[in-house]
Amino acid sequence: MATTTSITTTYAGEFAGKYISAALLAGNTIANGGLTIRPNVKFKEVVKRLELDGIVKDGSCDFADTSTLTLTERILQPKELQVNLELCKKDFRSDWDAIQMGYSAFDNLPSSFQEYLIGYVAGKVAQKNEQNIWAGAVAEGSFDGFSTLLAADAGKIAVTGTAVDASNVVVELGKVIDAIPPALYGREDLHVYVPQNVFKAYKRHLATVGGSVQGNNQDINIESFDGVKIFMANGLPSDKMIATTKDNLHFGTGLLSDSQEVRVLDMADLDGSQNVRVIMRFTAGVQYGVAADIVTYGIA
């Protein structure tokens, strides 16, 4: 009698956390520390920002409470999302066998076939989550990203955008830097978040002018522009830029929530097929703290 291999597996709540984490936190922006992560938001969380002015006064014998305290609040409410996929085992079996036999270039070997499938799906979710963070809009399978949220907020510092290439990238980046409030300029966690096309344009410009005394055949590491760190955000749409501090941008999810679930369901025992259903349920969303501390480029 032939041996039947079933790979039906369920992870729920806290036990699903490591798989959900791999799916949501592996994108370019989060993996490289571009945002403040709030990992245990069960429903909603208040993002608070405290500002003080007039805090230092002339000395006197009296207590003079004359400074102004401003507390800004915005609501971070991650959206419930899910993945429902049906995959055919035979489409992955050759790759899986190669990994098990050591013929693959991957360093981290999955301990089981279900983890291999979950890892495959998690990679796709991470890519989609990166896009949602910067350009998402409330629709099927998405949440409002920073571009959408900021476009609706008149309190931001808006710079008119244009098509960016190697010939104008320095001028356009300079417009963003010039618009940054003096109180933010020089802060360690201040970044200009740029899309791939702006990053490549700046790198090409540096190559043409011999940046860092390097030629066209040498790699040029881009770290800053006019003293402000450059962060390439893969999910940011072309010709858009955002300048602010890391602590002003928040990503929320609920890694320990009971509503999180990862399930791999082998359909062989149910309908005789070679199909495997992969199910993920999770929450994700973004929010910023103070719009006045954000410079946008090309985001109306």
Where are these regions (language model features)?
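Long, hydrophobic/aromatic-enriched structural stretches that serve as scaffold segments
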Residues: I55-E115
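Helix N-cap / beta->alpha transition motif
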Residues: C88, F92-D95, V194-V198, T244-T245, ...
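Short coil/turn segments at secondary-structure boundaries
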Residues: I133-V138, E188-P195, G215-D219
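Short helix/loop capping segments that flank catalytic or ligand/cofactor-binding pockets
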Residues: D95-W96, E130, A201-K203
